[in-house]
């Protein structure tokens, strides 16, 4: 797998040709295959992240905290620990000095806006969805974000969406309805509230994706992911938790057993962001997003293993239909000028 995450790049020889690639025509295919592999891996990490967070929310101090406070405190702790993992990775790969420089740029500010939308807003809705509807159901609905991204791109970026793309959007929404229409067995009295809050995450991540793709024209993906996570935790700690009285819960969590559970979830979350941004960089967002959305399928697997979930045929069918719709959305998207510019940046003409 090409090590874009580790920061290695083909070394050009005296003629300017990428000497690390002996067959020039193989470079794009090799990079794209690596990007698709990273996208699959990122989905697995994110599925594990959501299920492990669901376990943590059922532990002290979150289980005893107010319904509004617990998911927000868990989100702040998760993003803070994930930021620590990602900063350590940047330091290990020699990128630490790029963080403040990127943050001070215009594209860095765009990333901050994406972080607020995808972090405190979307992530909080996602965690409330897990708390009230269960991890597998919340993840199934939030997996429709590629379709949301397609709609937003059409409206705000004026990107064309083909008939196949619109069909995919309809199929994706239908899959989410199939997966979430009937409450699961068990004590989940606020199931539909959880579904509505998971929908907030879906919209928020769609908006975040559009903003982040624009910002990554000038900011390296690994650095962009780290700035996104760091901005999110700052907003949680400075703004959100003080407003809801959640700082004592966060402080209590730092000395509890649940800290280690969230630490594991944060490691998976950090790995997911690193691999997902690498996938976008190598394969392009239109190819990486649907494979990443397989996290809903991974969530079922991890829920069965870690929580003893017995998935219903309806849930499994809904997830599969959702993923099929996501594939239709991105396979029906025409190549835009941004896609071609991204290819030029990743695969210079001299290396082709």
Which role does the model predict for each range below?
Residues 1-47, 58-72, 77-114, 127, ...:
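Membrane-interface interhelical linkers
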Residues 41, 77, 119, 123, ...:
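Helix-helix packing/entry segments at the starts of transmembrane helices
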Residues 47, 51, 80, 116-120, ...:
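Hydrophobic/small/kink-forming positions within alpha-helical transmembrane segments
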Residues 53, 149-153, 208, 212, ...:
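Hydrophobic/aromatic and small-residue hotspots that mark the transmembrane alpha-helices
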Residues 72-84, 128-145, 191-204, 254-269, ...:
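Structural signature of hydrophobic alpha-helical transmembrane segments
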Residues 80-84, 170-176, 199, 203, ...:
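Hydrophobic alpha-helical transmembrane segments of multipass integral membrane proteins
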